[in-house]
Amino acid sequence: MKDIVSKVIRGFHFLRCYGVKDFFVRLREKGEEQGITYDEWKKLHSLTEKQLQEQKKAAESWVNKPFFRVVIEKELEEEISPATLKSLENQTYDQWSIEENEQAAMILFLKNGDVLAEHALYTIACLSDEKDLIYYDDDKITDVNNEPVPFFKPDYNLDLLRTENYFGTSFVVKCEFIEKAGLQEKLCNITGKNRIYEEIQNRIQKAAEREIQLYELILCCIEHTERIGHISDILVHHMENKNMDPIYWDYYLQRQCELVEQHLQRMGEKAKVTVENQLQACSVQYYVTEHERVSIIIPNKDEIEVLQKCLDGIKKTNYDNCEIIIVENNSCKDTFSFYHRIAPEEEMVHGVQTFQGKLSHNIDIKVVVWENEFNYSKLNNFGVQFATGKYYIFLNNDVEMIGTDWILRLSGDCHRNKVGVAGVKLYYPDDTVQHAGIVIGIGGSKRGIAANMFQGLPREEHGYQNRASLQAENGRR
C-alpha cells in the first residue's frame, strides 16, 4: 500500500511539473519499459565470423598500421596467463608485441588473466589517429556462478573520474603523447621498478599499488589532453578477485585520495578530498574562499505553507551572502498579505510592483510581481532582471533543504573553470530519487532529448555503478 501511495504522489508531482500531455507520455513509456539480459545483449552485439574476417582484410590494406606494445601487469615470477596470450593471438589485428618495441605507437595495459575480445585491437586502432587516451567497456566475473557482469561506462567524465577510476585497469595511451607530456617516469613506474611499490611489504597492498599507478597515469594524461576516446563496446573480460580483502580497499582509497589531491593542486582547483568507504570512492568538495553574492529565484503562486517551508530551509544555510527573489504570479489576496509580512517595504521599480525585506540578518528577500500568464522560463528570466548576485539558483517553491551547506557546494562547483551550471540530487517526499542528474539520449524519451536519472530509486540505494551517489558531469551518456 505504501508503495502505491508513493507512486501516486510522484505521479501528481510529475503532472504538476510537466503537464497533462507529458504525464500521459511518461505513463505510456513506463508501460513499455523492459530490459534484456547480458546474454541477450551479447547476442545482439557479437560480431559474426564474416565480420571478423572482413576486419583482417581491411587491416592488411592499411598504409599506416599502429603497433601495440602490450603491458601485462603480473608478479615477476608469475607466468603470463595462457588465456591472455591466446586472446592476443586471436586478434583480427596482428600488430602487437608483449616486448618493448621502438616501433610501438600505442601502449595497451592488461592484467594477467584478462581476455581481449577478438576485435579489440582492430577497434582501438581505428580510433588511434584521433585520440591520445582510449578506454572501453568491460565485464568481470564476480559472482559465485561465474557469470560475467558488464560495466557499461559513460563517455569521458572528469568529475566522475576524480571520484573513481572508471576507466579501469585496461586502457590504451599513445606513445608519442607520453613523450610530449613528459610522462615517461609515470610510465616507468608501471613497466619498471617503482620505489613506492618496492618498499611495500604487504602482498595485498602491493596489488593495490599496481592499480593505483595506472590511475595516476590516467590523471596525469588528462591534465595534458582532451583527446580522450571512449569505445562503447566490451573489449576486455576481467577475472575479478571475488574476496577482495579490506586491507586492499583501505590502502587503495587512501592512495587514491592522495593522488586526486595532487592532481587538483596541479590543476589549480581548490577542493577537499575525503574517502567514501561505502562507495569505495572519493568525495571531492570544491570550495570558494570568498562568498560572492548568490540570487535565489523562486516562482510562486499561492501555496503559502509550501513556500514558507522552502524559505525556512534557506534560512538555515551557512552561506552568508545571498538574496531571495520570489516571482509572484497571479496569487490571491491572502498570499499578498503573506508577502507584506516577510517583505514589508512596497514600491514600484521600473513599473513593477515589488516588496522588499530581510529573511534573516544575512539574507535579503524581494517579491516581484509578474502579471502575465504562467510560463516557467519567462518567470525565471523576469526574476533575473532584479537579481544582484554573481550566481543564480533557480528553485521550485516546494523544495525543502536537507543540509546547510548546499549553497557552498553549488557555488564551489560553479566557480570552477568550464563549469556553467551545477545541480543537486533531489528526493520526493517518500525518500525516493526525483533526479540524480540529467543524461542526454537516455532511453529515446518521447518527451525530448534528455531525461532524469534514477527516478524512483530508494534513497539508501546508489544506482548503477554507484552513479546516483557520485558527483559527475551531467549530459554524459
Predicted regions and their residues:
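Short aromatic/hydrophobic "clamp" motif used to bind/position activated sugar donors
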Residues: 107, 392
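Glycine-rich, basic loop-to-helix element that forms the pyrophosphate-binding segment
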Residues: 101-103, 370-387
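A short, conserved alpha-helix in the catalytic core of glycosyltransferases
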Residues: 177, 188-233, 260, 406-411, ...
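Short, acidic, metal-binding catalytic loop of nucleotide-sugar glycosyltransferases
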Residues: 59-65, 85-95, 312-321
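Conserved donor NDP-sugar-binding/catalytic core segment of glycosyltransferases
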Residues: 118-149, 176, 226-227, 399-446
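A recurrent flexible, glycine/aromatic-enriched loop bordering the glycosyltransferase active site
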Residues: 148-177, 377-378, 441-477
